[in-house]
């Protein structure tokens, strides 16, 4: 961010939200290059190692030349890798990456200034960004709540909705026109936002721009939920992967009433936001609204949310995208955990003179359980086991060194143990570790044309140590494994505040 402030003179451009001139600045594409663009894309001459402003200008000019972008029947061959279709996608990739960097610059600086002004209030902002900070909040608050709304956030069907949302913040008509033109011409967008996994998984190409636009859309939607204020302020930063999620949240806390002045119909629900037992959290495209209120109150919330999406965002949300459940009878499927509130009976024997009696005290406990079946499915998809969970060898890794193979398997095992460390029942994780250990052994045995038993006998205990987490190694040195204290530490849930995303097995290679 210091590089942005060093290179960009914002007093003339971004203070009036004029982004279009920045598109023609060469260093912008240098920043975009650092975020994953192909090195050869923006080079005028591969030997010069300089980004060419001429190429950027040519690309924008070609985008506005309709005849150049329309594919004719003569160029419809799918095997023509260097044909017009490849060039068209290449142009869009370059412009989208550059545009995404540009629109993020002013929002990034606003966030920095906001954090600097309120540094004393949010000292632990780095830790609070962790997605694991949601679960301590659940443990603290959900024990006293009754009902929960599980909400699947609708996505905009029409591209113009995204442009109109951004229009309130970006006053530069040229930039908006370029964005609109780009979205309408990029044919893969429709398939991107209509697939089942569109909320959580974005296309590898042009990911930055689409993630920015979706986050901006969600940011506007979540402006009505800033009633969280101080009681759940540590959840401000539990977002799913982009800068924009946290930008305006801090400022909006001080302007609660202004959020609801856009229509008279929503002023009547202000009293709902003042409810101290109403809490909202979100990860990716799923959000949860929990309350201590009655079922009637939650049905009102469902009605208000559907009407809000329709009136303010022109989004049609089907009622089945919002589920009302009672916490005591239903488990939340959230962030790869099954979370529930269950009652534990604590029997106390009381003796008074000659009479004795038993007192049964029900105690509420928040449980988090690993979703073992989807996790095994992920391992099967990554070719560590079959669909039944039986370990198999990772054939694509047999060309690696033995140390690299063991390190890769051990890293995946430690990452999964790290993420699911908060589970109340860790027995299911032992099955995952078993699959990875045996898959690693099968891979090494296949490489050396040996048997698994012979290979494990040769490696011994050193092989298993690669699959231990750092916490397990430390505890094994301090406490004996069979002691009651050690068993409690091994089995007890604990959460980390350095986890910012769910581990993806498919991308670990």
Curated annotation (Swiss-Prot):
Gene Ontology, cellular component aspect: chloroplast
Example of a GO MF term: RNA binding
Keyword line: Chloroplast, mRNA processing, Plastid, RNA-binding, tRNA processing
Record localization: Plastid, Chloroplast
Single GO biological process annotation from the record: tRNA processing
Disulfide bond positions: none
Stretch forming the signal peptide: none
Function comment: Usually encoded in the trnK tRNA gene intron. Probably assists in splicing its own and other chloroplast group II introns.
Family: Belongs to the intron maturase 2 family. MatK subfamily.
Name this polypeptide is given: Maturase K
Organism: Pereskia aculeata (Barbados gooseberry)
């Amino acid at each position: 961010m210091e590089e942005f402030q060093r290179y960009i003179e914002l007093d003339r451009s971004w203070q009036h939200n004029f982004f279009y001139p920045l598109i023609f600045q060469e260093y912008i594409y240098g920043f975009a290059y650092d975020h994953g663009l192909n090195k050869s894309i923006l080079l005028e001459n591969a030997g010069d190692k300089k980004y060419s402003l001429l190429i950027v200008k040519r690309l924008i000019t070609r985008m506005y030349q309709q005849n150049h972008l329309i594919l004719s029947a003569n160029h419809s061959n799918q095997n023509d890798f260097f044909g017009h279709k490849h060039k068209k996608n290449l142009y869009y990739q370059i412009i989208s990456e550059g545009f995404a960097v540009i629109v993020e610059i002013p929002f990034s600086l606003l966030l920095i200034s906001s954090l600097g002004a309120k540094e004393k209030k949010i000292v632990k902002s780095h830790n609070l960004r962790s997605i694991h900070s949601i679960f301590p909040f659940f443990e603290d608050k959900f024990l006293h709540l009754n009902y929960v709304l599980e909400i699947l956030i609708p996505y905009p069907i029409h591209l113009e909705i995204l442009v109109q949302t951004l229009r309130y913040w970006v006053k530069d008509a040229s930039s908006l026109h370029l964005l609109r033109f780009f979205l309408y011409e990029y044919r893969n967008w429709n398939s991107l936002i209509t697939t089942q996994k569109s909320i959580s998984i974005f296309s590898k190409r042009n990911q930055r721009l689409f993630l920015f636009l979706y986050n901006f859309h969600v940011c506007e939607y979540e402006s009505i939920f800033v009633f969280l204020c101080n009681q759940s302020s540590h959840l401000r930063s539990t977002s799913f992967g982009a800068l924009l999620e946290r930008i305006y949240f801090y400022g909006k806390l001080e302007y609660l009433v202004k959020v609801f002045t856009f229509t008279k119909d929503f002023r009547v629900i202000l009293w709902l936001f003042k409810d101290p037992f109403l809490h909202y959290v979100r990860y990716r495209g799923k959000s949860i609204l929990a309350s201590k209120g009655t079922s009637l109150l939650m049905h009102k919330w469902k009605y208000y949310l559907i009407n809000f999406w329709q009136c303010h965002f022109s989004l049609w949300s089907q009622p089945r995208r919002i589920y009302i459940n009672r916490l005591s009878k239903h488990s939340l499927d959230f962030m790869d955990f099954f979370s529930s509130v269950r009652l534990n009976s604590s029997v106390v024997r009381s003796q008074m003179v000659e009479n004795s009696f038993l007192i049964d005290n029900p105690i509420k406990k928040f449980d988090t359980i690993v979703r073992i079946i989807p996790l095994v499915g992920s391992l099967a998809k990554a070719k560590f086991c079959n669909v039944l969970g039986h370990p198999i060898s990772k054939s694509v890794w047999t060309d690696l060194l033995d140390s690299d193979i063991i390190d890769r398997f051990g890293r995946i095992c430690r990452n999964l143990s790290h993420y699911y460390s908060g589970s109340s029942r860790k027995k299911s994780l032992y099955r995952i570790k078993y699959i990875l250990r045996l898959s690693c052994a099968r891979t090494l045995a296949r490489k050396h044309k040996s048997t698994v038993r012979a290979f494990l006998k040769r490696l011994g205990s050193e092989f298993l140590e690669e699959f231990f987490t750092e916490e397990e190694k430390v505890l094994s040195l301090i406490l004996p494994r069979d002691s009651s204290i050690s068993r409690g530490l091994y089995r007890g849930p604990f959460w980390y505040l350095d986890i910012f995303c769910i581990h993806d097995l498919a991308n670990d290679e």
